[in-house]
Swiss-Prot record:
Top-level division of the source organism's lineage: Bacteria
Pfam family for this entry, one: PS_pyruv_trans
GO biological process terms held by the UniProt record: polysaccharide biosynthetic process
InterPro entries referenced in this protein's UniProt entry, alphabetically: Polysacch_pyruvyl_Trfase
Record gene name: exoV
Protein name: Succinoglycan biosynthesis protein ExoV
Amino acid sequence: MKPYYWESQHGNFGDDLNLWLWDFLLPGFREVYPETLLVGVGTVLNRALLPKATHKLVIGSGFGYGTLPDMSDPKEWDIRSVRGPLTAAKVGVAPELGIIDPAVMVADLPEFQGLRKIYKRSFVPHWESAIAGLWPAICDAVGLNYIDPRGEAKDVIRKIGQSELIVAESMHGAILADAFRVPWTAVSTSHSINSFKWNDWAQTLGVTYRPRRVPVSTRAEAMIKGARFWGMDFQAKEPQPEDPNRRQIDGDLAVAEREPRQTSLRAAAKRALAAPATLALWQASRAAPQLSKDSALAERKERFRTVLDGIRRDYF
């Protein structure tokens, strides 16, 4: 088998973890059924992403963008589980198959056991925020550790597990925090954050997606997200493409990656414009966090292990 995942040109740990997670969960899967795609972690049940006429084994994937492919042919699709009940309803499978996002199983890897707490509070933005926001400087100002979701997946995950509290705009920031039993608070900077996929996961564990509103931090970030910034409306002129690979982000907006040399006056002006975002993020970091019940997480993980047992029986 070959693991399928959406590879962001900017990097996104929640997708990139597919590169090694399945070697832990299903050792030897790459040596069997070479014609089969293992479709795992991610919002990838999208007609524009998955190839046709290829056998696909779906384990915990979610819907959330674009259009669902026709998944009715059992010769092409073996659907063992999906991310949650909302995806199950969209796909048309039994709600019992909406078990959990497989990323929760990362916490079982030996290398992530016994992580020492290093960070009091950490912020994990959405990758779009990381591209064009002023979030590292804002985190410094409000006493948060900044975790860049574009970083190497295991490094990002380790920092989440080493935190005492997570403020998450990244859904997998919250998923991994919950898996490591780290309390978390959800935030959202724009309507481009996909609430369907958040609720899909949240309903599996009995938590609620009620993101605290945090304004965008820069004009460039507003332009990427089609948001408002200091009274200026940057609503997108065209709808998002069905295929996320076709979405183009102007490289000139990627301020977080370029880190240009700036005068102290210019930097001070940017910090002043980001004051609403700074205050809102500070408030979010002091709000009452969430955490699913130990029993709810354990029950879902056990059900997912049963799915893995069935796959081993049928494919190995």
